[in-house]
Amino acid sequence: MSNQSTNDQDQIPSAEDTNDLIAQRQAKLDEISAAGKIAYPNQFKRTDYAEDLQKQFEGITKQEIEENAANGGKTQVSIAGRVMLNRGAFIVIQDMTGRIQLYVARKELDEDSLALIKSLDLGDIIGVSGYIGRSGKGDLYVHIEQITLLTKSLRPMPNKFHGLADTEARYRNRHLDLMTNESSRNTFMIRSQVISGIRKFMLNERFMEVETPMMHPIPGGAVARPFITHHNALDMPLYLRIAPELYLKRLVVGGFERVFEINRSFRNEGVSTRHNPEFTMIEFYQAYADYKDLMDLTERLFNQLAMDILGTTELTYQEETISLKAPFARLSMTDAIAQYAEGFDMSKVADRDYLADYAQNVLKQQVKEGFGIGKLQTIIFEETAEHKLRQPTFITQYPAETSPLARRNDENPEITDRFELFIGGREIANGFSELNDPADQAERFHNQVAEKDAGDDEAMHFDADYIEALAYGLPPTAGEGIGIDRLVMLFTDAASIRDVILFPHMRIKH
């Protein structure tokens, strides 16, 4: 069997062939050690990156490069990367920025260098020093003067044409996915840009970045089922955080008037194209602001991110054009029900019996005896309207029953000063004016405990320490959480949340 430089790039090896290829590669590594050479050298000084060189020489012709070299102006470079193609006269390597060709001038290289080039397999990592040239086809290349094997790849790479066609294989072997899939690499580079862009925006708005506990003695800050663990030394249960909210608001009580945290939260719930048990979010709080101020801030943030990363406020998501240009649409929950719930009688929007009947018999949703008007309205909204909110839309006036941490509206205490932002039929952000009345908060915690006792695993616990902190005085404050994974999905046109998480949770493969 010929070596991989001319064979295993063009077909998918069988299991037997894979074992043969691994054995061949191991033999090559053994030869290096037997010759008294360092198998994994750690000394190579890279001076350049592929993308930087492509940009530096963009528009400079082959003739201009050669004339410059003839006049003593060779551009010397040192570059390193993974071998993606080896066709004898030309090698293609890939580094963190992209790909570039290497030119093999056989008459100018010594025997050791030629032997090394001949033995290269796809996936090997090499370092090259030489000078810049351009091929007759116009491709930029590095003319090899010195070449060093830095790391021997002992396993064959996925086929460059078929790649990792199986989606699950891509998730389980993200290192291979990134190695062979340019689209996947771009996705995670954009993810990095989104996070750094959010951080830059918040710092410019005078927010302070903070860190709060990942393990909580009492789960809180959101209505969700937590992961539970046990602290052996303290002999007490701990909960992976479902949200950092209650800790962040303690910081506002303490005098940090604008705080934010970008970190993971955990919810022991279902896995889908929109949900992962471990997810990344930014949560932030601003004193002397209300929920309307945060809607305005969110519009500015999304507009800035789109312009900085995409160069436009219009993007395409799943073949649908979405505009992130402000202002976003704003619609109350009941108005959304009126607009999207087919056959719904709006004259009975506050009639519990009618709401329960519609939810159960029209929408086929489970209705429990303890569900109030607000809970039923929320169910109907989620089932009839949520997925139809394609363009950015703030839904406001959420019921107090389903918003245990939000401030009641001054004119109608049955609703709260809260919003959720939907884009592409998915919730992207949730924010509200914060409840800062300790007596009202204690009452709502008691209601949540009653729901938990009635069998609702997602209802909140009573957090006495937080009530005590509120009693010292929380200034008028608004807070918001933005799901970064879903935002990245939007910016990268990803159909599944797993496409934008480097290592999504998967069932163990036996």
Curated annotation (Swiss-Prot):
Coiled-coil ranges (or none): none
UniProt enzyme class: ligase
Binding-site positions, Mg(2+) 2: 427
Entry keyword set: Aminoacyl-tRNA synthetase, ATP-binding, Cytoplasm, Ligase, Magnesium, Metal-binding, Nucleotide-binding, Protein biosynthesis
Taxonomy of the source species: Bacteria, Pseudomonadati, Pseudomonadota, Gammaproteobacteria, Moraxellales
The protein's name in its UniProt record: Lysine--tRNA ligase
Main location: cytoplasm
Cofactor comment text: Binds 3 Mg(2+) ions per subunit.
Entry keyword annotation includes Transmembrane: no
Pfam families: tRNA-synt_2 (PF00152), tRNA_anti-codon (PF01336)
GO terms of biological process kind: lysyl-tRNA aminoacylation
Cofactors (names): Mg(2+)
Species of provenance: Psychrobacter sp. (strain PRwf-1)
Residues that, per the record, bind Mg(2+) 1: 420, 427
One example GO MF annotation: lysine-tRNA ligase activity
CDD domains: LysRS_core, LysRS_N
Gene coding for it: lysS
Quaternary data: Homodimer.
EC number(s) recorded for this UniProt protein: 6.1.1.6
Catalyzed reactions: tRNA(Lys) + L-lysine + ATP = L-lysyl-tRNA(Lys) + AMP + diphosphate
Gene3D superfamilies in the record: Bira Bifunctional Protein, Domain 2, Nucleic acid-binding proteins
